[in-house]
């Protein structure tokens, strides 16, 4: 049985998550999507089920499933599986709305720390909605607003129709998260394919930083930022493992997400890795072939010691 793809929908208070969810829950888009949201909105309901753990599940007229929880996320996820396995509901994708002040890290780790959830669900990606009108002020005042951007695989910029010029905001978002592309969404109307198949938590060959890349100093320094490390020389696998272990020992609480492609000395294949806080994985990818071997690593975190991280990898040069 193929695992169920999961998309996390994050964003600060007022960013437009509810508007986007209303679009998902009401449009005739043909997807079989289950949505875990904080509160039910005005949606057309065909049926209502009460799960074993007080998880309220509603089947909607467009075939989507709407689920609200008065308990832990883990229990709600298990309730959905139970209802699906009993044939009471049918869905092949899950979208989870995170609260406006939610820390995305522990929610991500839920899908890697529970055996059943790890087997039955596949975390596809994190989508962050950003209010173009108020984002700068929110990110200045609340580190959590920056963190939501830092964890994202894709960023959806909302309210651009009333915000005016967003170029500086886009530059700031790119400094926080160098790997997430930025899209514009107006009133929640978006091609749902932009929400899905990000492969954000899969080991894949596409490890690049967003373009253009900015090198000027921001007027206000972000607490959350991204560091892109590029190496044009091979590294020893045991030495790079030591560097990563030391980074995790020292800065695991600050590291949010990291992803990379490594040129390992003496190996014809590329080594891919990705991680969230203390959890990470690595695997061999395809041969380099005609591509010039190199290493690219992207670290996103809170007040990361950039000089120390760069020096640690520079020390791998032989």
Give names to the regions the model predicted.
Residues 86, 118, 144-147, 219:
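Structural motif
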Residues 92, 223-227, 295-297:
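Short amphipathic alpha-helical segments
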Residues 4, 15, 19, 68-75, ...:
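Charged, alpha-helix-enriched surfaces in structured cytosolic catalytic cores
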Residues 2-138:
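Nucleotide-state-sensitive switch-loop elements of NTP-binding domains
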Residues 290-300:
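C-terminal engagement modules used by replication, chromatin/transcription, nuclear envelope/ESCRT
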Residues 132, 136-151, 155:
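Flexible active-site lid/hinge loop adjacent to a nucleotide/diphosphate
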Residues 147-289, 302-318:
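C-terminal accessory "lid"/substrate-recognition subdomains
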């Amino acid at each position: 049985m193929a695992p169920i793809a999961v998309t996390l929908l994050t964003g600060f208070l007022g960013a437009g998550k509810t508007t986007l969810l209303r679009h998902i829950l009401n449009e005739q888009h043909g997807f079989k999507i289950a949505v875990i949201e904080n509160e039910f909105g005005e949606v057309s309901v065909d049926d209502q089920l009460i799960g074993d753990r007080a998880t309220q599940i509603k089947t909607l007229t467009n075939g989507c499933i709407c689920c609200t929880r008065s308990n832990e996320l883990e229990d709600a996820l298990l309730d959905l599986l139970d209802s699906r396995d009993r044939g009471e509901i049918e869905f092949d994708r899950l979208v989870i709305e995170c609260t406006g002040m939610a820390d995305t890290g522990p929610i991500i780790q839920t899908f890697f720390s529970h055996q059943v959830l790890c087997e039955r669900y596949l975390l596809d990606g994190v989508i962050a909605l950003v209010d173009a009108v108020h984002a700068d002020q929110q990110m200045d005042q609340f580190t959590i607003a920056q963190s939501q951007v830092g964890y994202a695989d894709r960023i959806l910029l909302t309210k651009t129709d009333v915000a005016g010029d967003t170029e500086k905001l886009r530059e700031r978002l790119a400094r926080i998260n160098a790997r997430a592309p930025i899209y514009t969404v107006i009133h929640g109307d978006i091609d749902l394919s932009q929400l899905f198949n990000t492969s954000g938590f899969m080991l894949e060959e596409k490890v690049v930083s967003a373009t253009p890349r900015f090198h000027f100093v921001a007027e206000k320094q972000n607490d959350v930022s991204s560091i892109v490390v590029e190496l044009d020389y091979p590294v020893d696998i045991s030495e790079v493992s030591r560097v990563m272990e030391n980074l995790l020992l020292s800065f695991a609480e600050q590291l949010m997400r990291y992803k990379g492609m490594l040129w390992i000395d003496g190996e014809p294949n590329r080594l891919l890795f990705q991680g969230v806080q203390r959890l990470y994985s690595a695997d061999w990818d395809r041969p380099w072939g005609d591509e010039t071997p190199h290493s690219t690593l992207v670290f996103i975190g809170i007040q990361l010691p950039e000089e120390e991280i760069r020096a640690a990898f520079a020390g791998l040069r032989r």
